[in-house]
Regions:
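The feature captures the conserved acid-bearing segment of alpha/beta-hydrolase catalytic domains
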Residues: 164, 169-236
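A short loop-to-beta-strand scaffold at the N-terminal edge of the catalytic core in hydrolase folds
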Residues: 1-8
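Conserved alpha/beta-hydrolase
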Residues: 37-62, 66-67
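Short beta-strand element of the alpha/beta-hydrolase
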Residues: 13-22
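C-terminal catalytic histidine-bearing segment of alpha/beta-hydrolase fold enzymes
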Residues: 224-257
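Alpha/beta-hydrolase active-site loop
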Residues: 59-138
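Gly/Ala-rich beta-loop-alpha elbow adjacent to hydrolase catalytic centers
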Residues: 145-156
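The serine-hydrolase catalytic nucleophile loop
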Residues: 27-35
Length: 257
């Protein structure tokens, strides 16, 4: 599923929520994505969940074998000299050739990674542009972008690089930076110009540590609109965990309700 739309149960909808699932997830993913997209319309908000395309950066990279240099041919009328080559000389040549090949392969891989990252960003941004345009067609007065997992990264990068005026808020849930991307969340978060809620599970050590770093980075920025909200993982009560998440997100988006 690429996208799922659920209109608001209201004749005058105020908000459209665009939900961006993470890598390996889809538009009705049971963790965070589907519960949120189904609950928001009950409170008068449109919901649109949009799956990410498969990333080129995650595809297996073809190994490029270095082609050995051809030996120079003797000039006409000359015969190649015949003499024994010391074993250590052969070893030195082999080592030098291998080192050159590794440097070339490393450079090629780095260039390919940068190109894939940019291509991935363009494809994802185009999909989010289409989602924003679709929400606007349904008369939403305000648009909120919600990202889950690596979807939070791409939502943040989209707002940082494109700064669409139609999107007024960002919610990041259990945010993760994908592998092999140009910018990480730590560098993106301070650049955001819209109010941002960063929801993380305080009971998960890795998530808590990453969230702490993002919080410190945001504090170094003047007039930051960044706010963190902690969640408690409930492995034995997933329904309760999802309800907790919805209440925290809704409470931040509409504190007066």
């Amino acid at each position: 599923l690429i996208a799922l739309w659920k209109p608001a149960d209201d004749s005058d909808p105020q908000v459209a929520v665009i939900i961006v699932p993470g890598a390996g997830e889809n538009a009705d993913w049971p963790d965070a994505v589907d519960p949120l997209r189904r609950k928001f319309p009950d409170f008068g908000w449109h919901s649109l969940s949009v799956s990410l395309p498969d990333l080129l950066a995650d595809a297996p990279q073809a190994r490029v074998e270095a082609t050995p240099a051809a030996a120079p041919e003797p000039a006409a009328g000359e015969s190649a000299p015949v003499k024994d080559t010391p074993a250590d000389a052969n070893a030195n040549v082999a080592q030098a050739t291998a080192a050159d090949a590794e440097v070339a392969q490393g450079t090629d891989a780095e260039q390919a990674s940068e190109q894939n990252d940019q291509a991935d960003a363009e494809r994802i941004f185009a999909r989010l542009d289409a989602a924003v345009a679709y929400a606007q067609q349904h008369n939403a007065r305000s648009i909120v972008l919600i990202g889950h997992g690596s979807g939070a990264y791409w939502a943040a990068r989209y707002l940082s690089e494109k700064q669409p005026p139609q999107v007024q808020k960002l919610v990041m849930i259990a945010a993760q930076t994908p592998a092999r991307v140009e910018h990480d969340l730590l560098s993106l978060t301070p650049t955001l110009k819209v109010p941002t809620a960063d929801l993380y599970f305080a009971t998960r050590t890795v998530d808590r540590h990453a969230a702490m770093q993002r919080l410190q980075a945001s504090k170094r920025q003047k007039d930051s609109h960044y706010k963190q909200l902690s969640l408690i993982a409930m492995p034995a009560n997933k329904a309760g965990e999802q309800e907790q998440l919805f209440r925290r997100v809704r409470g931040w988006m509409s504190p007066q309700q």
